[in-house]
């Protein structure tokens, strides 16, 4: 899925 800020 897509998350705000990106996956860290």
Swiss-Prot record:
It comes from the Eukaryota. On the 2D-gel the determined pI of this unknown protein is: 5.2, its MW is: 50 kDa. This is Unknown protein from 2D-PAGE of fibroblasts. It comes from Mus musculus (Mouse). The lineage of its organism: Eukaryota, Metazoa, Chordata, Craniata, Vertebrata.
């Amino acid at each position: 899925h897509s998350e705000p800020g990106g996956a860290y």
